[in-house]
């Protein structure tokens, strides 16, 4: 019996059905002879079990099923989920699993490549079940929304109701970084929306004719540099990064000597990080000089000032530079309107080649008749475009005029503006000071009012807040100020930050006085507004004599307690502002870990909050010279007395300490982390001296021009200008 093969037979012959369980290879008992008369009857429309069908054929009346009982489905029905082990599907071969496909939210396709039909399961045994109406129907949600007028749901994929035997892909796809699932599986993440989707959602509606009437709205981003706290700081070329003619001449002579005496491999691979571990700085000084000369020679070669044949000395110098600190590649020179050839927009054809001594050749000087791009004479530290060679400008050593490195003209020639009224012209001229004024006024008004609320409610049974309340108020107020003016003036809100950015990031020196004046004026206005709003509370709290009202601490900062000496007060402001400067430079460094769009202001608001909590107990944590001087002037005008300026703490405590602290904090960050060439920390020592000498000479010329001219000097100056 064990070796006998049992053939599957059907227990339903009259109905023409087949028992699929026997076809699946399931063993069955041999058919026993039935003593009852078999009466053929129609199959029940309900897909019942084979037992019910067999009993019906044998003449037994089937049991009546009540409506409360669940409908019994056959396990062989295509609508019944199979128990036990199931087949897993295979991903189509033409499925694109690349990261780009997944970033653009295109899920795994379940359609065949040729016909486009839905991929059916591969049967284990038996024929392929036909496609049911339930499977072919996409979803009932879209049908209802079309009829009812509701907005269709686009965030989730239409999912079938009930069981299904359609095969599922087994390849693990990358999780989509958004809650909106378009064609993929159920991917849940806490990382927020994808950048592409976020940028699309933040785009507002724009009428078709709006761009024609307001062309400034559609101009490219980063048309002008903005040294601010709302986004990464700009990368500019500063005078210390550009070689002089003498340095070019010496570099060419050294290159010829190095061709005859090749250097050690350790020196060649210096910038690749392969440095021999040694404490002898003299062994790498030559490599440092060669690496710097190579970068400068690449600059000269790019602008046609040096022949490329003189630059190929070693194998490493033939490799292109890829360091992010080389900001020459970041300057968009093609957008600068110049009289250049359209075939090579990166350099004008009229640039004279340099001879061996680093100066233009005589033939090139004679043939040089076409005008060069006009370079404005403004701040020495903004960019190389500020440097125009003069008669006393290092004896013609400066080559900045021959290298078009500027991408922004401070005379607003590269921008498109919407000038509709007369005020729009004035606003364009003073847009940065106006933005700084508005931001400081809003920031300090909120801060002063929060302090007044806590001070004047101190005698009440339930005071309205405490010191922690004011700390959070100052942090959120600073965040608001950065959001207001971050894209226009940069929202420095602090003279110490403006001076620090001038020294270490090339912020124009000519803009520093305007920024400081706007910040002091904004603090003055904010103090007047706050006093006007809480005047009755101040009188109720301290009386009509403002000198003894004990509300001065809500406006200005000073040592809060008698045991806090001068050194403690000074270094409290010094350390607090140094940490603030480190945070500003870290958030503005695009090579470090800059936050996302719009997050810099929020993070700096939190930084101000924690600084107020940490350093506010000793002195009130001014961290800002204008935040103290503006209210002092306002309180003196309101009648708080002239004793506000008798104590010199407001000079060395609120001005010297924050400015020196910001400079020191920026030095620490650049010495430890920053690698850009615009920082003086990364200048060679000779370049620092040369830049200082050049800066003193230029400002000496400007001061001499401000003096009344003597007789005969005006004509000589006019002739010199015409010769240029």
UniProtKB/Swiss-Prot annotation:
Residues 1-167, 248-267, 302-396 are annotated as: Disordered. It catalyses: H2O(in) = H2O(out); glycerol(in) = glycerol(out). Residues 456-472, 535-567, 617-647 are extracellular. InterPro entries: Aquaporin-like, MIP, MIP/Aquaporin. A motif (NPA 2) lies at residues 624-626. Keywords: Glycoprotein, Membrane, Repeat, Transmembrane, Transmembrane helix, Transport. Residues 1-434, 494-513, 589-595, 669-724 are cytoplasmic. The chain crosses the membrane at residues 435-455, 473-493, 514-534, 568-588, 596-616, 648-668. Residues 252-265 have a biased composition (Low complexity). Its main location: membrane. Residues 87-96, 307-325, 360-370 have a biased composition (Polar residues). Disruption phenotype: Leads to a slight reduction in the vegetative growth rate and delayed conidiation. GO terms for molecular function: glycerol channel activity; water channel activity. Induction: Expression is higher in vegetative hyphae than in conidia and infection structures. NCBIfam families: MIP (TIGR00861). This is Aquaglyceroporin-4. It comes from Botryotinia fuckeliana (strain B05.10) (Noble rot fungus).
């Amino acid at each position: 019996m064990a070796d006998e093969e049992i053939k599957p037979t059907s227990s339903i012959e009259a109905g023409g059905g087949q028992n699929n369980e026997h076809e699946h290879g399931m063993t069955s008992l041999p058919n026993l002879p039935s003593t009852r008369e078999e009466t053929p009857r129609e199959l029940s429309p309900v897909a019942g079990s084979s037992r019910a069908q067999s009993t019906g054929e044998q003449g037994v009346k089937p049991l009546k099923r009540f409506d409360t009982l669940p409908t019994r489905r056959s396990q062989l029905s295509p609508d019944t989920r199979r128990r036990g082990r199931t087949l897993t599907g295979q991903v189509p071969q033409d499925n694109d699993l690349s990261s780009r496909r997944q970033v653009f939210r295109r899920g795994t396709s379940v359609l065949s490549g040729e016909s486009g039909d839905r991929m059916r399961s591969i049967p284990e045994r038996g024929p392929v079940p036909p496609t049911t109406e339930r499977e072919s129907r996409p979803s009932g949600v879209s049908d209802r929304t079309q009829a009812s007028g509701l907005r269709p749901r686009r965030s989730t994929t239409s999912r079938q109701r009930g069981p299904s035997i359609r095969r599922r892909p087994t390849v693990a796809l990358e999780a989509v970084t958004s809650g909106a699932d378009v064609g993929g599986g159920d991917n849940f993440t806490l990382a927020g929306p994808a950048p592409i989707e976020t940028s699309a959602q933040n785009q507002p509606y724009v009428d078709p004719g709006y761009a024609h009437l307001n062309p400034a709205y559609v101009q490219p981003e980063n048309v002008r540099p903005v040294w601010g706290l709302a986004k990464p700081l700009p990368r500019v070329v500063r005078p210390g990064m550009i070689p002089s003619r003498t340095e070019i001449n010496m570099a060419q002579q050294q290159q010829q000597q190095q061709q005859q005496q090749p250097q050690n491999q350790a020196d060649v691979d210096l910038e690749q990080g392969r440095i021999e571990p040694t404490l002898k700085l003299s062994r790498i000084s030559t490599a440092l000089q060669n690496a710097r000369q190579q970068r400068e020679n690449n600059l000269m070669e790019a602008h046609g000032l040096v022949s490329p044949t003189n630059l190929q000395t070693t194998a490493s110098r033939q490799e292109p530079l890829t360091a992010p600190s080389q900001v020459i590649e970041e300057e968009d020179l093609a957008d600068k309107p110049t009289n250049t050839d359209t075939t090579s927009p990166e350099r004008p054809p009229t640039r004279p080649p340099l001879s061996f001594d680093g100066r233009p050749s005589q033939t090139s000087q004679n043939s040089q008749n076409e005008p060069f791009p006009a370079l404005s004479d403004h701040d020495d530290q903004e960019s190389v475009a500020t440097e125009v060679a003069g008669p006393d400008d290092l004896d013609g050593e400066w080559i900045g005029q021959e290298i078009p490195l500027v991408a922004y003209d401070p005379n607003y020639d590269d921008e498109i503006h919407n000038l509709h009224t007369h005020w729009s012209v004035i606003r364009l001229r003073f847009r940065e000071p106006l933005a700084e004024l508005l931001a400081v006024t809003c920031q300090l008004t909120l801060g002063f009012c929060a302090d007044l609320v806590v001070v004047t409610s101190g005698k009440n049974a339930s005071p309205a807040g405490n010191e922690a309340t004011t700390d959070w108020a100052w942090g959120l107020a600073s965040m608001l100020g950065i959001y207001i003016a971050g894209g226009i003036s940069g929202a420095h809100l602090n003279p110490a930050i403006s001076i620090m950015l001038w020294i270490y990031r090339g912020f124009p020196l000519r803009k520093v006085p305007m920024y400081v004046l706007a910040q002091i004026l904004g603090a003055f206005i904010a103090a007047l507004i706050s006093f006007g709003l809480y005047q009755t509370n101040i009188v109720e709290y301290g009386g009509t004599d403002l000198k003894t009202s004990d509300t001065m601490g809500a406006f200005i900062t000073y040592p809060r307690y008698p045991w806090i000496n001068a050194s403690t007060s000074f270094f409290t402001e010094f350390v607090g502002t140094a940490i603030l400067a480190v945070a500003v430079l870290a958030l503005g460094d695009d090579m470090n870990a800059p936050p996302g769009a719009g997050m810099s202001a929020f993070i700096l608001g939190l930084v101000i909050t924690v600084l107020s909590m940490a350093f506010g107990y000793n002195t009130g944590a001014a961290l800002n010279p204008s935040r103290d001087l503006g209210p002092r002037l306002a309180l003196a005008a309101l009648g708080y007395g002239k004793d506000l300026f008798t104590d010199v703490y407001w000079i060395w405590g609120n001005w010297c300490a924050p400015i020196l602290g910001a400079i020191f904090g920026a030095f620490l960050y650049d010495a430890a982390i920053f690698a850009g060439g615009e920082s003086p920390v990364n200048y060679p020592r000779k370049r620092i001296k040369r830049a200082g000498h050049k800066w003193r000479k230029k400002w000496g010329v400007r001061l001499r021009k401000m003096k009344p001219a003597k007789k005969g000097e005006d004509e000589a100056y006019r002739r010199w200008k015409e010769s240029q």
